[in-house]
Amino acid sequence: MFSPADNIFIILITGEFILGILGNGYIALVNWIDWIKKKKISTVDYILTNLVIARICLISVMVVNGIVIVLNPDVYTKNKQQIVIFTFWTFANYLNMWITTCLNVFYFLKIASSSHPLFLWLKWKIDMVVHWILLGCFAISLLVSLIAAIVLSCDYRFHAIAKHKRNITEMFHVSKIPYFEPLTLFNLFAIVPFIVSLISFFLLVRSLWRHTKQIKLYATGSRDPSTEVHVRAIKTMTSFIFFFFLYYISSILMTFSYLMTKYKLAVEFGEIAAILYPLGHSLILIVLNNKLRQTFVRMLTCRKIACMI
């Protein structure tokens, strides 16, 4: 029998799952149709398509994890189940982080202006090597998830042996969360791509500041397209920073939840807040991307006309 909190959690997480799949699926579908029509795809659309596919995987893993927690709160005490869930989550999490970082770096290279040789070389090369970069993101994520599975498996074995030792009963009692240390460690590693995104964000803001100063010197009274592109990219990256911060805090909350008396409630709250990252940022991308937004508006218009007929 589910508690009222469990019922609310299931309703909320189901709603987030539906919105997440629809939002990310919409981005993938629009880019795929555009790819078929034009027989080619732009670099930004290619990165976005890979990103939303990775986010669909992440949302699915998180929702499955949330439902399993409700149905079987003791799942984290079972080695095999926890290793499988944690491995898939690590892979999807890192893949999302690295592809999002690629998107943020791409925005910076394509929109910002600089005469530095390294910047110009990267700006020239990014379109040519994007396939290899995304393949590298996949390889890194797969490697990290396999390492996570091995570390977690060894950690479980150690605690299983320690549990039967009389002299270290206290140590096992303190370490009642066998996956606590691996989770903390891999959460910390996720900061690396975030730092790269943060650097790209500040460099883009600096580029906008320099560009604005130049515009003021040669003001024409008309709207500057470059400034609008800068602002749109900064809004996208700002939303990513906000949602990732929320996601990271939620992940830490879930990691430490078993130290709390209401651990199940803490995990449920953390899951709901964490899913806002792959859901919310993708919705922001739709709003700020001209092609995605205009396609969505046309769909709504056609639907209204069809209803009137």
From Swiss-Prot:
Note: Most taste cells may be activated by a limited number of bitter compounds; individual taste cells can discriminate among bitter stimuli.
Residues bearing attached sugar chains per UniProt: N167
Recorded family membership: Belongs to the G-protein coupled receptor T2R family.
Function summary: Receptor that may play a role in the perception of bitterness and is gustducin-linked. May play a role in sensing the chemical composition of the gastrointestinal content. The activity of this receptor may stimulate alpha gustducin, mediate PLC-beta-2 activation and lead to the gating of TRPM5.
Membrane association type: Multi-pass membrane protein
Pfam name, any one: TAS2R
Organism: Homo sapiens (Human)
GO CC annotations, alphabetized: membrane; plasma membrane
Sections of the chain in a coiled coil: none
Biological process annotations from GO: detection of chemical stimulus involved in sensory perception of bitter taste
Compartments in which it is found: Membrane
Residues annotated as transmembrane: 8-28, 51-71, 83-103, 132-152, 185-205, 240-260, 267-287
Tissue: Expressed in subsets of taste receptor cells of the tongue and palate epithelium and exclusively in gustducin-positive cells.
PANTHER family associated with the record: TASTE RECEPTOR TYPE 2 (PTHR11394), TASTE RECEPTOR TYPE 2 MEMBER 8 (PTHR11394:SF31)
Name assigned to this protein: Taste receptor type 2 member 8
Topological domains, Extracellular: 1-7, 72-82, 153-184, 261-266
Domain of life from the UniProt record: Eukaryota
GO molecular-function terms, A-Z: bitter taste receptor activity; G protein-coupled receptor activity; taste receptor activity
Cytoplasmic side: 29-50, 104-131, 206-239, 288-309
Predominant cellular place of this UniProt entry's protein: membrane
